[in-house]
Amino acid sequence: FSRKTWRIFLQVYVIGGDGTMRGAVVIFEEFKRCRLRISITGIPKNLDNDIEIIDKAFGFQTAVESAQ
């Protein structure tokens, strides 16, 4: 996407696990470098439950219940 294209966005939502969240940081750094005023919100969702800042991720409980 070009900088002109990104100007239509005010917010970006990223849904996923720890790898996705690391990617969101890279996107955030690029927005910052380009001085784009776009908010990024990370929504944790994974089966591994390995995202450090939360107790349980969406998807984890479903995986546990399905395995039982």
From Swiss-Prot:
Gene3D superfamilies associated with the record: 3.40.50.450
Enzyme Commission identifier(s): 2.7.1.11
GO-annotated biological processes: fructose 6-phosphate metabolic process
Cofactor: Mg(2+)
One Pfam family here: PFK
Transmembrane intervals: none
Marked site (Important for substrate specificity) residue numbers: G19
Pathway this chain belongs to: Carbohydrate degradation; glycolysis; D-glyceraldehyde 3-phosphate and glycerone phosphate from D-glucose: step 3/4
Keyword terms: Allosteric enzyme, ATP-binding, Cytoplasm, Glycolysis, Kinase, Magnesium, Metal-binding, Nucleotide-binding, Transferase
Cellular compartments annotated: Cytoplasm
SUPFAM superfamilies in UniProt: Phosphofructokinase
Recorded catalytic activity of this chain's protein: beta-D-fructose 6-phosphate + ATP = beta-D-fructose 1,6-bisphosphate + ADP + H(+)
CC per GO annotation: cytoplasm
Chain positions recorded as ATP binding sites: G17, D18, G19, T20
Residue numbers annotated as active site: D48 (proton acceptor)
Regulation of catalytic or functional activity: Allosterically activated by AMP.
GO molecular function, one term: ATP binding
Residues that, per the record, bind Mg(2+): D18
Highest taxon of the lineage: Eukaryota
The keyword Ribonucleoprotein belongs to this UniProt entry's keyword annotation: no
Assembly, per entry: Homotetramer.
PANTHER family xrefs: ATP-DEPENDENT 6-PHOSPHOFRUCTOKINASE 1
Similarity section: Belongs to the phosphofructokinase type A (PFKA) family. PPi-dependent PFK group II subfamily. Atypical ATP-dependent clade 'X' sub-subfamily.
Function: Catalyzes the phosphorylation of D-fructose 6-phosphate to fructose 1,6-bisphosphate by ATP, the first committing step of glycolysis.
Name of the protein in question: ATP-dependent 6-phosphofructokinase
Organism: Triticum aestivum
Organism ancestry: Eukaryota, Viridiplantae, Streptophyta, Embryophyta, Tracheophyta
